[in-house]
Design a protein with these regions (language model features):
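N-terminal Rossmann NAD(P)H-binding glycine-rich loop of SDR-like oxidoreductase domains
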Residues: 39, 43-47
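C-terminal hydrophobic helical "lid"/dimerization subdomain
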Residues: 157-209
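Glycine-rich phosphate-binding loop and adjacent beta-alpha segment
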Residues: 106-172, 207-208
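Residues at the starts of beta-strands that form the adenosine-phosphate
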Residues: 32, 56-57, 120, 145
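NAD(P)H cofactor-binding loop motif with strongest signal on the N-terminal glycine-rich segment
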Residues: 37-38, 103
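NAD(P)H dinucleotide-binding glycine-rich loop of Rossmann-like/cofactor-binding domains
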Residues: 1-33
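Adenosine-nucleotide cofactor-binding segment
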Residues: 51-106
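Hydrophobic/small residue at the entry helix of a nucleotide-binding pocket
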Residues: 10, 41-42, 106-107
Length: 209
């Protein structure tokens, strides 16, 4: 269970938020879904879940050497992180039916502008910053919805439902393949890699190691 942890629970919540477009909102069927920070703990599991749901997953990463890793998780397409840098128009061509954003920051400006009518952007991270410079056009012209994901505030009923769905949507052998078991000493050695963005996947601390 700790292989999934809060990251896995958050990824499940994000994926169900994206799915809400066709279920709760009775919108068009979801097809193309963008996942930012795709090599991270939440992103990796989200790629896997969304692919299992039958969506075409477009994974965003700054790590060119992880393309095969993301394809193995189910990503159909890999997009470089730089594609979401720089200035954005008020509205751009609608590309994404749904988005799982684990990064936050300036990239969201372009993501909002590229989301299709009725699309849902599930936001759960702030590694890229806490400020968003955007405009109201995606929201009032296309009905784009920003869906904040607060995993810690989920009710017991919601937790029971989400964890009950995990076995159907997550390949635990794949999660195990990108999960590292660390001792306390190894954890201290790993922190610099985390800060530099050189660590990917999941880490579990084993106090007996």
């Amino acid at each position: 269970a700790m292989m999934l942890g809060t990251a896995g629970f958050t990824a499940l919540l994000c994926s169900f938020a994206v799915k809400a477009k066709e279920e709760l909102l009775l919108g068009e069927k979801v097809k193309d879904v963008l996942v930012t920070g795709a090599t991270g703990g939440v992103g990796s599991i989200a790629v896997m879940i969304l692919s299992k749901m039958g969506y075409d997953v477009h994974a965003v990463t700054g790590k060119k050497d992880k393309n095969d890793y993301l394809k193995n998780l189910g990503a159909k397409n890999i997009i470089g992180r730089k594609e979401f840098e720089g200035e954005s128009k008020l509205l751009e061509k609608g590309v994404w039916d749904g988005v799982v954003d684990t990064v936050g920051g300036s990239a969201l400006t372009k993501i909002f502008a590229q989301t299709k009518p009725g699309g849902i952007v599930a936001a759960c991270g702030n590694a890229g910053g806490i400020k968003i410079n955007t405009n109201v056009m995606p929201f009032i012209i296309r009905g784009v919805k920003l869906w904040g994901i607060d995993s810690s505030g989920s009710s017991i009923k919601r937790r029971e439902f989400v964890w009950g769905e995990a076995a159907k949507l997550i390949d635990f052998s794949k999660v195990q393949s990108f999960t590292k078991e660390l001792s306390f000493t190894e954890l201290l050695e790993t922190y610099p890699k985390l800060l530099k963005g050189e660590f990917f996947g999941r880490a579990i601390v084993n106090p007996n190691k």
